[in-house]
């Protein structure tokens, strides 16, 4: 039955036989759903038009029209179509905005990195893409010494995704916990593996009508499923579930097998790698799996390890990463070619020791995997060997004797093969392939020196030395700039290579090691000290005029600012501090507070020959102020943990110069003018904390200053005491010389810097209006204002020197038998001294000296010297007394000389009180002729104060001024070698050069050089095959740099 349509639909009035079948379907559809007709009769159309002018909605008032009731079926009719509000421009814009809003709302539920929905995580954990990292991640980054502190930097580093240019309407603003775990796994050594669901980077696009994100969200609303048939038996359910699970397992296994097949095809290494079937021993399956590649399932060849601890052949993993993306083929964890590392040596040794069967015909040998290549090369047939066929003509010349054009012609085939290989395997890097071939050829011929040079060039280092090494050589060998430059040019001209670095490279290396390079901060800021940190060498007068209180200051002084010098010293010790923290099982990220104990030393030098040149006339004497970092501790778990302690506190290598001046130490005004600013900086640092970035982490440091490296003359100068010949014999107690001689042993330390300041005020103001003698007795010898705080102690070096000078005098008096004849003339006394000098030179090889020094004192104070002197003394009784006196002294000496007497000489420490009392008894009986009513300053300190100082400080020898005295010799050496004529510049160069000489960073280079030189690369007969030279056993650390 045909339906008649009005002509408005555009359908032709064709016969029923040829009408398209969809017409009948349309008729049936309108009946079934009672859809209102979209067509109307002409009369209704006119009415619709009229109503539209009145503003009434037309579609609401046009009901479906039925045909006449003549038995025919109703015919759908439709009025003339009118534009719906849906098709207006305004509605279209609203729909577009609404679509974008829905799109952006959908983005909020997706991860920016992997694209997964947050609904998959039952805890709904999410993290902002932009902003700082969370606390847990920040702690991990600090522990691993990473500088990144924001999510965009971490995401770019781990996933190679730049999120800084993200737009909120296109990209999600958060990422999921799974991606957060991947980033944690990247920077931690946790054994867990994290699954990354995508093989490629997720791409995000602006919203479109066919947007995948919005369509996926719509499709998520499913129709309600039908209620399950409750009459279905449990048995049938179980069977269906088992069948479904079996199908899933089968699909997964097939997918796994297919992915393995794909990776094997990608690797395509069956011709170059060995099958596990060639193993000579039938190993367990799990062991075979552990030594085989997880891609090609062959025995590992050139194995590499990923971050997730999976092992592959290098060729296989690189090919898979190139084709399948930067993910581990085993666990899908992110992995990049730069992350690949060689496995541990123990694994490689096991792998190389595996025995494999030779696959060649008629060869039944079993060889280790390490020697397999060498063995298989012997089986090459003669047809595979390139043999030149002499076709006559001119004799064939060697390759190196040909012209460049001829060389190209002869090597053309090889060049094409190498190029093809490089294009296929190495990304077209022909240079690297050729250099590697050359390197392997050199190694095969045992030409390792050339191979090392070539390898250095390939790594971009070149065959030359680093600037820091050249600087260490220059400083250690005392070369001036001009001398080093001559050596640099000579070596470069002779060898044709730049082994040493030019001077400008050394100056750049110097800047890092000198004070004024590193940034730091004080909390609270230092009083009366500039907050700028880029302060290098400054004038010693610190901007004062050329005269102080109308006193002319004829001096040249150069110094570092104290705080800047301490910062540079700490940064120079950075590796030692961090290593000390690791050795104490402390975390690297601990920020303190660290407590730094500093030993201060100051000493005057006489007879410093003046250089000719411009500048003021200055005295031929010098004063040096220096410091040594003795110990660094950190407060941890309610106790102080020692992270650094100076092993050789009296070495010149750790005594850092702070101030140099050409002045007389007895010149009180000049000394105070130059040292007062330095002392003001020191006092300010006592009440502040240093904030310094060490090892990438901001750490806090506190300082304790101990002025112990002063001789007695300088202590009396800076503490305002009378000179050494004063009645008040001691700088530690108030005893007079008479009191000390009557009571040799029992005294205690009473003096202090604060007490000396109070006594100076009493001396200055005389509040009790006393006479000079009474006032002097009240203040116990304080006659000037103290300006440097020193620790009441004994300087071990000067104690040795003072006591040796006294024994030298006793030897002379014993030769002259003064105990019998106390009234000898001056000529006789000179004759005794000449006799002693001549005998010591003959027996002990001790040359006479004008003034006692440390070396002479050490040689003089021995039992052999006493035996030699006894040859000149006739009385046996005096022999015994003299030998006993020396024996007691040698038993006491280690207590004040050793750095830690409780460990090094505990017996001598325990017996010290007894020995000192016996020593005092001998002085007051056998040697009464000299010590009746008087005693020397250092004998008094040795007998009375040593045990108390040891109990307080733990050591006397460690706090001695010996390092500063050794530094005085270096000062003379540096001053001689310097080439600049101006005195001011000369002092700057000496200070800079001396500071670099004490750098621990530079000392490590020279210690390595000295250790190798000492070992001499000698063959150790006891060395194992793995270490034929035995270098590890023969390396020794040197005490100091060689001159």
From Swiss-Prot:
Subcellular location: Nucleus
Site residues by UniProt (Essential for DNA hairpin formation, participates in base-stacking interactions near the cleavage site): 896
Effect after changing residue 474 to H: In OS; found in patients with an atypical form of severe combined immunodeficiency/Omenn syndrome
One Gene Ontology term, aspect cellular component: nucleus
Region (Disordered): 40-80
Ligand binding (Zn(2+) 3): 308, 310, 328, 331
Result for mutant: residue 375 to D: Found in a patient with T and B cell immunodeficiency and progressive multifocal leukoencephalopathy; uncertain significance
Tissue spec. comment: Maturing lymphoid cells.
Zinc finger residue ranges, RAG1-type: 354-383
Effect of residue 612 to R: Found in a patient with an atypical form of combined immunodeficiency; uncertain significance
GO molecular function, one term: ubiquitin-protein transferase activity
UniProt cofactor(s): Mg(2+); Mn(2+)
Impact when changing residue 841 to W: In T-CMVA; also found in a patient with an atypical form of severe combined immunodeficiency /Omenn syndrome
Basic and acidic residues bias: start-end ranges: 40-54
Self-association state and partner proteins as the record states: Homodimer. Component of the RAG complex composed of core components RAG1 and RAG2, and associated component HMGB1 or HMGB2. Interacts with DCAF1, leading to recruitment of the CUL4A-RBX1-DDB1-DCAF1/VPRBP complex to ubiquitinate proteins and limit error-prone repair during V(D)J recombination.
Family membership noted in the UniProt record: Belongs to the RAG1 family.
Protein name: V(D)J recombination-activating protein 1
Taxonomic classification: Eukaryota, Metazoa, Chordata, Craniata, Vertebrata
